[in-house]
Amino acid sequence: MTDSNQTIPSISDIHDGALAARLQSALDNKTKPLGALGRLESLALRIGLVLGSETPVLEAPQMLVCAADHGLAARGVSAFPSDVTWQMVENFLAGGAAVSVLALQHGLALTVVDCGVRRDFQARPGLVSRRIAAGTADASAGPAMTAEQCAQAIANGREVVRALPGNALLLGEMGIGNSSAAALLLARLAGLDIDGCTGSGTGLDAAGLARKREVLRDVLALHAAASEPLDALAAFGGFEIATLVGAVLQAAQERRVIVIDGFIASAAVLVAQALQPHVAQRCVAAHSSAEPGHALLLKHLGLEPLLNLDLRLGEGSGGALAWPLLESACRILREMASFEAAGVSRKDS
């Protein structure tokens, strides 16, 4: 049995006024009008602060995709059957999924974690087995996870990240029904109306969305006492989200740059931030998805997304698409010339 108190590491405040000033000065002195690179400059500043460097280098970036099934999916909250979870895990590993293609394109090492899929997988490179159970319990009938299962999943996420190289972690997930868990976590931890947090997920029609919202209202009411972050996580699930919570906490403790994908990955950061309030300092929001709850969640975290492409896929696909922007931000700091070095006159010269 894993004690939840032992699974939550201390996360320090990385604010460094002196380093921030040096980074800003370096950016201001590049051969360009002041602020002309817009949000690429604020991104460079954030990465520099996370890595504690005036010349940050992103090394061995890791794409971590956590997968699990949800008991709540039996209530018809998704347009797809639960079998799609294991089928997509196979697709990830075969190189046929969007995140597989994009990770390969951008040089991101892909690791897929079975956190609780209702299927046995053959061992192979790129697959890590950390299965808690064959899917969570139905949250409409009781807690999705026990407290012990929740703590073990968080511990698993920390363990997986400890074994990965590099200083950047990109978050991905797969689990039919997990947009429901994300909506429930957002409503409870941010104090928002569940209907506004709930979208069509994998493509529900209007009737399906109305049914999903009704189910989630009932689930939220059933677990009215689950107000603390770990209690809410155990009540709503899922195993992949809890494993990502652990991954985020470990990456934050190690001062890795954490690249958040869509709604579900962001829900894991929401829980981690509720547990340790300096987590979001290490995070970059890759994009704002078409799920209505995602923009609300990012606003709650105080994060501004880099892209808005109407994505609603998950997997880590948005993080992979945003990755070149992070690399460009670092190169601006490291390689772009200053006015003095280039012999270029300033505006006020």
From Swiss-Prot:
> Which EC class is the enzyme in?
transferase
Q: Which GO terms describe its molecular function?
A: nicotinate-nucleotide-dimethylbenzimidazole phosphoribosyltransferase activity
Alphabetically ordered keywords of this record: Cobalamin biosynthesis, Glycosyltransferase, Transferase
Question: Which biological processes are named by the entry's GO terms?
Answer: cobalamin biosynthetic process
Q: What is its EC number?
A: 2.4.2.21
Active-site positions, per UniProt? 315 (proton acceptor)
- In this record, what's one Pfam family? DBI_PRT
InterPro entries assigned: Nict_dMeBzImd_PRibTrfase, Nict_dMeBzImd_PRibTrfase_bact, Nict_dMeBzImd_PRibTrfase_N, Nict_dMeBzImd_PRibTrfase_sf
Q: Which reaction does it catalyse?
A: 5,6-dimethylbenzimidazole + nicotinate beta-D-ribonucleotide = alpha-ribazole 5'-phosphate + nicotinate + H(+)
- Which pathway does it serve? Nucleoside biosynthesis; alpha-ribazole biosynthesis; alpha-ribazole from 5,6-dimethylbenzimidazole: step 1/2
Highest taxon of the lineage: Bacteria
What family is this? Belongs to the CobT family.
Task: Write out the function statement from the record.
Answer: Catalyzes the synthesis of alpha-ribazole-5'-phosphate from nicotinate mononucleotide (NAMN) and 5,6-dimethylbenzimidazole (DMB).
Name this protein carries in UniProt: Nicotinate-nucleotide--dimethylbenzimidazole phosphoribosyltransferase
